[in-house]
């Protein structure tokens, strides 16, 4: 039997080491803007990419009090931070944002950065709450969509 421990002990939302099942659940239930960002913005298949991330084992998933998986996140080499979410974040929006901040604040990297599809309003709002600064717009991916570096 595998016992999972919270990486961060939040009051309502559990942040746990990723499992293959959680990665598949997130990929199957992505917010529409997150799916669009992965597919149109990066030219990638969310299921393939999230399963690959789970197999690498360096990311976490967020589990809300009603048992739903709200998303998964990770930090890759060089401080590249990412998060993809399901609609479960809307069931506990304030708590989710606070726990996401605790996750970001717990990281040891000197710098966390990435790019975000400028159409992804939920993530832009969350990134601002998390304390990231928006640096510049760039064209990115196979469709040369407008992304914002943070």
Identify the meaning behind each predicted range.
Residues 2-44:
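Short amphipathic alpha-helix that is part of the acyltransferase structural core
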Residues 82-98:
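A short, internal acetyl-CoA/4′-phosphopantetheine-binding micro-motif in the GNAT/acyltransferase core
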Residues 98-112, 121, 130-132:
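Conserved acyl-CoA
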Residues 73-79, 136:
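A conserved beta-strand-loop-helix scaffold within acyl/acetyltransferase catalytic domains
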Residues 112-128, 139-143:
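Conserved beta-strand-loop-alpha-helix junction that forms the acyl-donor binding cleft
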Residues 56-72:
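Conserved beta-hairpin
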Residues 38-58:
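Active-site rim helix/loop that mediates acceptor-substrate recognition in acyltransferases
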Residues 4, 134-135:
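N-terminal secretory/targeting leader peptides
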């Amino acid at each position: 039997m595998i016992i999972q421990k919270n990486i961060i002990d939040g009051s309502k939302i559990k942040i746990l080491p990723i499992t293959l099942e959680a990665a598949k659940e997130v990929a199957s239930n992505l917010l529409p803007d997150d799916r669009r960002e992965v597919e149109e913005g990066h030219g990638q298949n969310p299921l393939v990419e999230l399963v690959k991330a789970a197999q690498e084992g360096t990311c976490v998933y967020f589990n809300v009090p009603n048992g739903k998986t709200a998303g998964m996140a990770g930090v890759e080499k060089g401080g590249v931070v990412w998060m993809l979410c399901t609609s479960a974040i809307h069931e506990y929006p304030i708590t989710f944002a606070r726990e996401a901040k605790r996750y970001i604040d717990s990281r040891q990297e000197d710098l966390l950065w990435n790019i975000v599809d400028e159409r992804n309003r939920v993530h832009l709002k969350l990134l601002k709450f998390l304390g990231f600064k928006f640096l510049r717009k760039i064209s990115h991916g196979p469709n040369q969509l407008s992304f914002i570096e943070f």
